[in-house]
């Protein structure tokens, strides 16, 4: 690949160099007389700042590389074919996610990216390096992750969140964002849940924020769609605005959460498929929990909610299943409401297609 160098420019700057082009809104891409070391110095993490010279097919996936593999590489003839000026291999060996240079702070969205990497390589024991945590904190102190209409757009932030949601340990991304004090900059509504108590009888984990991440973890274990995982993450936002005098109870938190979900979706420019499911799960999840006690009229209203397209109702029910089991000690609890409502939904679809609505009532 051609070595390149990205530098911060003034907003909307149009470079004169014919070999340059604008990147995002305030980056300029240079390709003239750029060395490979200069190129690598602009990469976000040291583990991504390794290049191989022509002659070595270096394609080992990070998650499959053991310390023994790296030691062999260090002691083999192939080491001479690697360009590793920032000790990326050493950081792989030490399981460290470390920024390559101060250039990391020129694109604050990298904060989300490194937490996404922490989620991806969580099972391999990777952690964010302390010096990188310090750099991130200095960036946040300068409010550099504030979402705006220039470089830090809602779309760019959500793109990283979307990628993070697809990881097997998606909850780790948000734990890391919370630990870095970065979550409040991108999703303050979610951050506000931490420290808010719930009734221990139903929520042994007590903390509303912890519960939300447990629900996301369950959604990942159930291999639910990204849209469903996003809905799982936001389903209890209303608990963050409960009157403190009413705690630990949260009567009406479903309705209270809907405008908060809408705020998140608007700020991050979330696609309709995500916002639609997140809104309905937030508003109606208690109805699914009480499915066996609902009357025909309420059930019909749920099934006939025209906001849900195709088979999104099934995703809705499955997120509620994740909610019921995303609680301390209840991870393997049965949830018959899911089978009950999915069977009703299938009957509903059949009755509507055959124009026999009474079959559902029966």
What are these regions (language model features)?
Residues 1-362:
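Catalytic cores of the polymerase beta-like nucleotidyltransferase superfamily
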């Amino acid at each position: 690949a051609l070595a390149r160098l990205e530098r911060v420019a003034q907003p909307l700057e149009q470079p004169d160099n014919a070999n340059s082009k604008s990147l995002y809104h305030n980056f300029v891409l240079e390709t003239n007389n750029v060395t490979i070391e200069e190129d690598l110095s602009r990469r976000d993490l040291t583990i991504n700042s390794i290049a191989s010279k022509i002659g070595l097919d270096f394609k080992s996936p990070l998650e499959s590389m053991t310390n023994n593999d790296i030691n062999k590489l260090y002691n083999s003839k192939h080491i001479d074919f690697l360009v590793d000026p920032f000790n990326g291999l050493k950081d792989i060996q030490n399981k460290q996610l470390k920024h390559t240079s101060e250039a990391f702070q020129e694109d604050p969205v990298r904060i989300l990216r490194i937490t996404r990497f922490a989620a991806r390589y969580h099972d391999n024991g990777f952690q964010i390096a302390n010096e990188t945590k310090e750099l991130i904190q200095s960036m946040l102190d300068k409010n550099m992750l504030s979402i705006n209409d220039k470089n830090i757009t809602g779309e760019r932030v959500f793109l990283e969140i979307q990628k993070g949601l697809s990881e097997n340990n998606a909850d780790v991304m948000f734990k890391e964002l919370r630990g870095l004090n970065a979550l409040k900059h991108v999703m303050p509504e979610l951050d506000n849940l931490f420290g808010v108590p719930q009734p221990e009888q139903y929520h042994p984990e007590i903390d509303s924020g912890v519960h939300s991440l447990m629900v996301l973890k369950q959604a990942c274990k159930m291999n639910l769609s990204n849209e469903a995982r996003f809905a799982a993450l936001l389903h209890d936002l209303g608990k963050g605005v409960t009157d403190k005098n009413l705690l630990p109870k949260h009567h009406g938190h479903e309705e209270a959460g809907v405008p908060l979900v809408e705020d998140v979706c608007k700020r991050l420019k979330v696609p309709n498929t995500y916002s639609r499911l997140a809104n309905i799960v937030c508003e109606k999840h208690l109805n699914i929990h009480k499915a066996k006690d609902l009357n025909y009229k309420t059930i019909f209203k749920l099934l006939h909610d025209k906001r849900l397209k195709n088979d999104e109702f099934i995703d809705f029910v499955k997120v509620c299943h994740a909610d019921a089991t995303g609680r301390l000690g209840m991870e393997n609890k049965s949830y018959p409401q899911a089978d009950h409502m999915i069977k009703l939904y299938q009957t509903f679809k059949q009755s509507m297609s055959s124009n026999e609505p009474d079959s559902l009532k029966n």
